[in-house]
């Protein structure tokens, strides 16, 4: 029985080689629209789909392959006598290969196009053929990914057929693709309508397999959103090895912290926790301030600066071991200096962080929440003493940092530098003591949540703290305010909590 292949692709890379390979094996090629013209122009013997259906393309190409003569040829089960009798009666030929890739909705939805223009890139005929062929994979070889063309050709060369195992894998890839494609369309159409829809569909594409996860015994891979360009799916590696699982997680937080600030800012980070954060006039100044805040923890850490890095900054950075240095750009002479460290990963971050929903898996489900991107409802002074202008700036600085520290979290600040960071403690007084121990000489203290008792204020007073900022909201707020008044400390309530679990 003569075999037939239906080829209809938007991305034509590799399709000529595949079509020629099939024609050399006497497989009849059927095609439509632009693919038909492309194959014909390249001297591939091909039939237009309208020759099979006796029905022309219509509605500006919206209807080309949606026809029973096409889909019956794909869906007929070859060892089902009734199916084959029906095909014979209707003079329908079987289709044994379906080679289809889709309109580039993933790419177009991210471009600056009108709603109507984006809708036109929603493919209908392609998914319908792919799903039909994938359902009948026992009898039909379905190719939705150009990377699989060679695998299929190799099996045919070696065995004169495509194995059941590969057919099944290719069918699975179709439904995997369709799941992501439909999710992207769904999210596009529901954007701004339902923040938390009944069914959660997300669309991510694998960028790379990672050597391992958090630890060597854990497998891992990195997936990129198909729906928007965030900071972590658009960076460029300018030096060093590929990023690890831990590198990517750490870089994400370090870059977010640095981008919290309009002024030049640096975040040094280790194990997903900031260890030094500073703002200032230039990249060298903020790097040195962040380094001085904790010269021990920064070793082997990640550094992100929200401005172009110059040679003077790079010369300071290469004095110690760093895993990653990230910035929006680098001077050429700065890159030359950084590249003297062969294993130092130098990352150009092209985009600022996007405020999208945050997801975390639990056993049997996913929790979804909005990003913590609201700093305060107000800055309400609740004590007799008011903070100075500089203290208020440091308070706001502290709140921008503390929301990235695991709760319970305290940050001590002086002159635009996080001099002490205490986090991940199961009670607030321990976090306070940790931050104060590291941040001796700090003037301002920021807390991610309210003080349940006055003990944190008393501890802060012992260590010279002059101003405190916190959300407020405890039934014992008055005790903390009274303690501040006793010690001559100003206190500001924001009304916004920043737990990080």
From Swiss-Prot:
<feature type="domain" description="MGS-like">
    <location>
        <begin position="1"/>
        <end position="144"/>
    </location>
</feature>
<dbReference type="GO" id="GO:0003937">
    <property type="term" value="F:IMP cyclohydrolase activity"/>
</dbReference>
<dbReference type="Pfam" id="PF01808">
    <property type="entry name" value="AICARFT_IMPCHas"/>
</dbReference>
<keyword id="KW-0378">Hydrolase</keyword>
<dbReference type="GO" id="GO:0005829">
    <property type="term" value="C:cytosol"/>
</dbReference>
<dbReference type="InterPro" id="IPR024051">
    <property type="entry name" value="AICAR_Tfase_dup_dom_sf"/>
</dbReference>
<protein>
    <recommendedName>
        <fullName>Bifunctional purine biosynthesis protein PurH</fullName>
        <ecNumber>2.1.2.3</ecNumber>
        <ecNumber>3.5.4.10</ecNumber>
    </recommendedName>
</protein>
<comment type="similarity">
    <text>Belongs to the PurH family.</text>
</comment>
<keyword id="KW-0808">Transferase</keyword>
<dbReference type="InterPro" id="IPR002695">
    <property type="entry name" value="PurH-like"/>
</dbReference>
<keyword id="KW-0658">Purine biosynthesis</keyword>
<comment type="pathway">
    <text>Purine metabolism; IMP biosynthesis via de novo pathway; 5-formamido-1-(5-phospho-D-ribosyl)imidazole-4-carboxamide from 5-amino-1-(5-phospho-D-ribosyl)imidazole-4-carboxamide (10-formyl THF route): step 1/1.</text>
</comment>
<dbReference type="InterPro" id="IPR011607">
    <property type="entry name" value="MGS-like_dom"/>
</dbReference>
<dbReference type="GO" id="GO:0004643">
    <property type="term" value="F:phosphoribosylaminoimidazolecarboxamide formyltransferase activity"/>
</dbReference>
<dbReference type="InterPro" id="IPR036914">
    <property type="entry name" value="MGS-like_dom_sf"/>
</dbReference>
<dbReference type="InterPro" id="IPR016193">
    <property type="entry name" value="Cytidine_deaminase-like"/>
</dbReference>
<dbReference type="Pfam" id="PF02142">
    <property type="entry name" value="MGS"/>
</dbReference>
<dbReference type="GO" id="GO:0006189">
    <property type="term" value="P:'de novo' IMP biosynthetic process"/>
</dbReference>
<comment type="pathway">
    <text>Purine metabolism; IMP biosynthesis via de novo pathway; IMP from 5-formamido-1-(5-phospho-D-ribosyl)imidazole-4-carboxamide: step 1/1.</text>
</comment>
<keyword id="KW-0511">Multifunctional enzyme</keyword>
């Amino acid at each position: 029985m003569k075999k037939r292949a239906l080829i209809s692709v938007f991305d034509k890379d590799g399709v000529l080689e595949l079509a020629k390979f099939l024609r050399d094996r006497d497989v009849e090629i059927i095609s439509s629209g632009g693919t038909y013209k492309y194959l014909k122009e390249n001297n591939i013997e091909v039939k237009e789909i309208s020759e099979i259906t006796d029905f022309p393309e219509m509605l500006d190409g919206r209807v080309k392959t949606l026809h029973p003569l096409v889909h019956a040829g794909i869906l007929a089960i070859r060892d089902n006598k009734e199916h084959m009798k029906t095909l014979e009666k209707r003079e329908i030929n079987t289709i044994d290969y379906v080679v289809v890739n889709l309109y580039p909705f993933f790419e177009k939805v991210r471009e600056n196009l009108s709603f109507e223009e984006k809708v036109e890139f929603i493919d209908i005929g392609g998914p319908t053929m792919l799903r039909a062929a994938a359902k009948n994979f026992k009898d039909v070889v379905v190719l939705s990914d150009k990377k699989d063309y060679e695998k299929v050709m190799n099996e045919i060369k070696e065995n004169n057929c495509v194995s059941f195992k590969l057919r099944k894998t290719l069918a699975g890839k179709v439904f995997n693709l369709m799941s992501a494609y439909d999710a992207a369309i769904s999210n596009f159409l529901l954007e701004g309508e339902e923040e938390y829809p009944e069914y959660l569909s997300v669309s991510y594409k694998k960028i790379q397999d990672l050597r391992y996860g958090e630890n060597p015994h854990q497998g891992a891979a990195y997936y990129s959103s198909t729906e928007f360009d965030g900071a972590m799916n658009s960076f460029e590696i300018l030096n060093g090895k590929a990023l690890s699982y831990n590198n990517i997680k750490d870089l994400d937080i370090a870059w977010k912290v640095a981008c919290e600030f309009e002024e030049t800012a640096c975040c040094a980070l280790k194990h997903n926790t900031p260890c030094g954060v500073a703002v200032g006039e230039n990249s060298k100044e903020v790097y040195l301030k962040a380094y001085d805040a904790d010269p021990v923890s920064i070793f082997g850490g990640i550094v992100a600066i929200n401005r172009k890095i110059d040679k003077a900054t790079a010369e300071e950075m290469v004095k110690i071991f760093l895993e990653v240095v990230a910035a929006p750009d680098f001077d050429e002479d700065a890159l030359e200096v950084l590249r003297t460290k062969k294993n130092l990963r130098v990352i150009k971050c092209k985009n600022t962080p996007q405020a999208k929903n945050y997801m975390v898996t639990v056993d049997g489900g996913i929790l979804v929440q909005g990003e913590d991107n609201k700093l305060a409802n107000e800055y309400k002074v609740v004590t007799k003493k008011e903070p100075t202008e500089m203290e208020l700036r440091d308070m706001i600085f502290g709140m921008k940092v503390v929301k990235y520290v695991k709760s319970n979290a305290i940050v001590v600040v002086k002159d635009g530098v996080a001099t002490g960071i205490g986090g991940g403690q199961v009670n607030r007084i321990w976090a306070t003591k940790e931050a104060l121990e590291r941040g001796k000489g700090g003037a301002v203290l920021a807390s991610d949540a309210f003080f349940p008792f006055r003990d944190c204020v008393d501890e802060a007073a012992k260590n010279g703290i002059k101003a405190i900022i916190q959300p407020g909201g405890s039934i014992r707020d008055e005790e903390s305010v009274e303690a501040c008044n006793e010690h001559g400390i100003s206190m500001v309530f924001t009304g916004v909590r920043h737990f990080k679990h």
